[in-house]
From Swiss-Prot:
The keyword Iron does not apply. Belongs to the 6-phosphogluconate dehydrogenase family. This is 6-phosphogluconate dehydrogenase, decarboxylating. NADP(+) binds at A1, V2, M3, G4, N22, R23, S24, V63, K64, A65, N91. One of its GO terms (biological process) is D-gluconate metabolic process. The keyword NADP applies. The active site is at K172 (proton acceptor), E179 (proton donor). PROSITE patterns: 6PGD. Pfam families: 6PGD (PF00393), NAD_binding_2 (PF03446). Pathway: Carbohydrate degradation; pentose phosphate pathway; D-ribulose 5-phosphate from D-glucose 6-phosphate (oxidative stage): step 3/3. GO terms for molecular function: NADP binding; phosphogluconate dehydrogenase (decarboxylating) activity.
Amino acid sequence: AVMGRNLALNIESRGYTVSIFNRSREKTEEVIAENPGKKLVPYYTVKEFVESLETPRRILLMVKAGAGTDAAIDSLKPYLDKGDIIIDGGNTFFQDTIRRNRELSAEGFNFIGTGVSGGEEGALKGPSIMPGGQKEAYELVAPILTKIAAVAEDGEPCVTYIGADGAGHYVKMVHNGIEYGDMQLIAEAYSLLKGGLNLSNEELAQTFTEWNNGELSSYLIDITKDIFTKKDEDGNYLVDVILDEAANKGTGKWTSQSALDLGEPLSLITESVFARYISSLKDQRVAASKVLSGPQAQPAGNKAEFIEKVRRALYLGKIVSYAQGFSQLRAASEEYNWDLNYGEIAKIFRAGCIIRAQFLQKITDAYAENPQIANLLLAPYFKQIADDYQQALRDVVAYAVQNGIPVPTFAAAVAYYDSYRAAVLPANLIQAQRDYFGAHTYKRI
């Protein structure tokens, strides 16, 4: 409801009159009461709401993904005309969007599955928008979407046509997977700085402030520095009194499931999903901590040196995560015939969304230089960072393993990097085993 309200207010603020409808009359009245003088026109029946719109109608749905979306579409259909456009701005599973696009197209309606990132504030002030569906229908809604989207530093709106049917929601799904990876990498960096150097929250805030002024400049690093200094009403640092169980809404899981379907090694993002799952086993972890032994953690040595190693490890880990995510976008584009433009996708992530970061311009540049590049790690800028920073990543992972500090995504980054650059892997033995017990055959060199 909040996302829908904020998007309506965003659209209204760009000079449009907006018809609004909610199943709950009270919620509709609440929005009107809280926003006097706005060009928001309330309707209390679906029929009146639909009939209030100019044709071709442009209807933005912001409902909970799943059965609720189908129910909302079914309630609209009796009053729609051929050529009307439904835009689904929810966190919808892309296969559902493909199905709805097919079904509605057969009935003469247009359906645009649209990823919207930026949370409640982004919805109000300007989100990153990822629309997928019929190109001609997109052209009819593009003027509105362009006006309400976030604007990058170079003045470009953070919206672009992604591709047919489920392409927009697929890109939003991978965006969310990358978000999981970013957050877990940052959490592991925090754990290392706390465990290895015993940094105070004030020192952590200072460290993240410095990081945010360099290569790691991003929304997530920016909010993390603020989190470290936040205190509760009793004067305690808030981060220290928050239970260590990270919840999830399932979009990270979808990204990993799709990777398995496509045969893509999305190891870092998948480890970030599993890290949330193991965090939720709090009671088991507390019990296990009293039974299972581990090494006694030793100090990490020189403070400035270790902080810099963790910074480098975090940046290279982030690059590996994005390399995996964009590699998966390439595989999905081929599988679903979407013809994705990876440079444009990186561009619209530069503002408005949760993963917005300075280094996204480097991804856009890499694809501008070579649109067919198989993996971002092969692009000159990222290859150079890998050359310069891999030792720091290896040192940090080695320290963590020796001292019993879990770093699943940092470790996944090293393993992926070394596997990807390996001309020969021990998979020949696995294939021999498969042939031995199952006559699966093998290829000779």
